[in-house]
A protein has these predicted regions:
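Class I SAM-dependent methyltransferase SAM/SAH-binding core
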Residues: 5-40
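Short strand-turn motif at the edge of the Rossmann-like AdoMet-binding core
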Residues: 9, 87-91
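Hydrophobic/aromatic residues located in beta-strands of well-ordered beta-sheets
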Residues: 19, 84-86
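A short acidic, Gly/Pro-enriched loop at the edge of an enzyme's catalytic core
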Residues: 37-52
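Active-site micro-motifs of SAM-dependent methyltransferase domains
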Residues: 38, 58-62, 113
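A short SAM/SAH-binding and catalytic strip from SAM-dependent methyltransferases
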Residues: 49-65
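A short glycine-rich, Lys/Arg-flanked "PGG" loop and its adjoining helix->strand segment in the class I
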Residues: 67-83
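Conserved Class I S-adenosyl-L-methionine
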Residues: 97-131
């Protein structure tokens, strides 16, 4: 039997039973202490079936290079058809604007730039929408 992991990345104090809870700080008894801007992540290729990123992505990857490395790591550790659940504040909401720890707005369009099917479609049709 192959058992795939479920990760709660950047969990902070939101420890979820049945998930490997990962955070940069070990303030809340996390399962794995790891900085999500440090590569590679301590997980095998294709070993994860689900990832929760709840109000995490807007806090990491300030430089485009680091942000792209983060997405590449998620791709590397996820098995085919893995589910990644992303929760983020709206970039125009006061909570996003007023929080100095928010380093980048995350939008659906911005994330769609990394969807393989869309990139192949854009490549085929000619528009320069790929990163």
């Amino acid at each position: 039997w192959i058992i795939f992991m479920k990760l709660n990345l950047g969990c902070g104090n939101k420890i979820i039973e049945g998930y490997v809870n990962v955070d940069k700080f070990d303030l809340y008894n996390v399962n794995v202490k790891h900085d999500l801007e440090t590569f590679p992540y301590p997980f095998e290729d294709d070993s994860v079936k689900e990832i929760i990123l709840s109000h995490v992505l807007e806090h990491i990857g300030q430089s485009p290079e680091i942000f792209i490395k983060i997405l590449k790591e998620l791709y590397r550790i996820c098995k085919n058809q893995a589910l990644i659940k992303i929760s983020i504040p709206h970039p125009r909401h006061d909570n996003f604007i007023s929080d100095p720890t928010h380093v980048r707005p995350i939008t659906i369009f911005g994330l769609s730039l990394f969807v393989r099917d869309l990139n192949e479609k854009w490549e085929k049709n000619g528009p320069a929408n790929t990163p």
